[in-house]
């Protein structure tokens, strides 16, 4: 970390400094249920960031629930765009989690029907044990407006369709990011058009050079940002 004085010094030298905001940063959700599953790590899921019904970005991989929201590799990758939109004044964003991205809607429905045939006389919560981590089952059922105490055999075809849709787009509302002090990378900085890329020298002030986070360069992982600084 740093004091951030470099940005003020760059401005004083006449340089343009683009808006600063956290990137590669955990996201804060409105939903309180994340606290009930904090510490739960999911692998092979797809997270999609949406705004006004439009999918902004999506990434496949691992994520982690926390007491404040979500983090992990795919969340950090999405966070740059989320943070940019929030910094621009967007009040909230939608995050859709596809918990079974390897299956098409039809194949997931077939899988659900097979499980439900096997657990026909059991409560719905127990009928989902082969599909989801135990602590996540009731959350998904609630999002699909289903009771965990319902009998599996009583779940209608329409309700099953709703459950499949929920499994492939479990909704979360993004209302913020963790503070800049917790971010891996800072987005924004001294405009690259004002820097000579061969020497990193200022095009405006002789003898002034820039490097690292001070420059308006960032990417999806910390490794890329380290390489940019070293280069």
Regions picked out by a protein language model, each given a short descriptive name:
Residues 1-3, 9-11, 63-68, 208-210:
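Short hydrophobic core segments
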Residues 1-2, 28-32, 152-159:
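Short beta-strand to alpha-helix junction loop
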Residues 26, 70-73, 185, 215-227:
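Glycine-rich phosphate/pyrophosphate-binding beta-alpha loops
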Residues 138-218:
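A glycine-rich dinucleotide-binding beta-alpha-beta segment and adjacent secondary-structure elements
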Residues 1-5, 73, 103, 107, ...:
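Conserved active-site and cofactor/substrate-binding residues in soluble primary-metabolism enzymes
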Residues 7, 24, 94-96, 124-130, ...:
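Domain-scale detector for complete catalytic domains at protein termini or as standalone homologs
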Residues 1-13, 217-231:
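A conserved FAD-binding loop/helix module that cradles the flavin
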Residues 15-21, 25-151:
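An anion/pyrophosphate-binding glycine-rich loop and adjacent beta-alpha core
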